[in-house]
Amino acid sequence: PACRISQMGQAGRYMTEYRELRKTYGILDIIKTPELAREVTMQPINAFDLDAAIIFADILPPLEGMGLDLEFIKGEGPVLHNPVRSLADVERLATPDPKEALWFTLDAIKLTRETLDPLGIPLIGFSGAPFTLAAYAVEGGGSKNHDKVKSMMMGEPDAWHQFMTKLSDVVGQYMLAQAEAGAQVLQLFDSWVGQLAPDDYRERVMPYSKRALEIASEAGVPMIHFGTNTNGMLEDIRDAGGDVIGVDWRIDIDVAAKRLGNSVAVQGNLDPVALFAPWQELEPRAKTVLDRMQGRHGHIFNLGHGILPQTPVDNVKRLCEFVHEYTSK
């Protein structure tokens, strides 16, 4: 059978249709209007030969539901105006019911399923993982060194434990609610976990990712667990949970697959920047990923992280077609 392909962040700024919509609406407006979220989710499905849709959402609204003031600032990205810096800050945080705090994404999932079902294309729901959400919440936005969040993790164990416990509940319940709303696959994104030493991951992060995935697993749908820069802790990511482990481009995918063993499928791992290259450069890179996984049970072809804003649409189209043609021979 042809290899399955989906692409992280497959809806978004590289598509003209999305840029048109953004002239009128801010990103949070789109996410919080289920009809618009469905429209954006469907844009790549209508344009490319993809095997799955990914709900158009963002990892940060769960933090808003907990009481943080989120704003997307043009040119800066997300900013949280009241970051979490102390035990008192942690204690103030709510653990909201996702059906109330995140109703818009759940409604978007229901609506999108109505459109996708006749096409026979499944819908993927997702959430940020506890550590990645903590990183945004403590830093107050994106960060180069993640010194504030790591300082809390190392220096304030009580605050850290309480915070990560709250986050794991929120994330687990949110993923569960997405599956109940109709998501047929769930993905946990731990985008910043590669900033950690493996020991710190094992002792101070992994138990909470595991807890979130255990809560979500009650839904009985396949789960993808993805982090970037995880070569130092691949086996730990696997042991935290997930049926599919996503890997980035910084490791040969066959090496990652060998380390992960046969209990999980593997997703990845083309460098997103390869999509900027001319086709004669892009094609052999895609071929290499597929050849390295040939004959292995369970591979989802994907990028090693999110698709970048200026990505040429023609290359995305050709890549989707190529993956299906090459693997169905």
Predicted regions and their residues:
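N-terminal basic, low-complexity leaders that serve as flexible interaction/assembly modules and, when applicable
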Residues: P1-L68, F72-K74, D291, V313-K329
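Glycine-/small-residue-rich beta-strand-loop submotif within the FAD-binding core of flavoenzymes
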Residues: L21-T24, L70-P96, H146-S151, I253
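Intrinsic-disorder/low-complexity, polar/charged segments
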Residues: T33, R85-S86, N145, P278
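Flexible, glycine-rich active-site loops centered on histidine and acidic residues
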Residues: M66, L70, L87, R296-G298
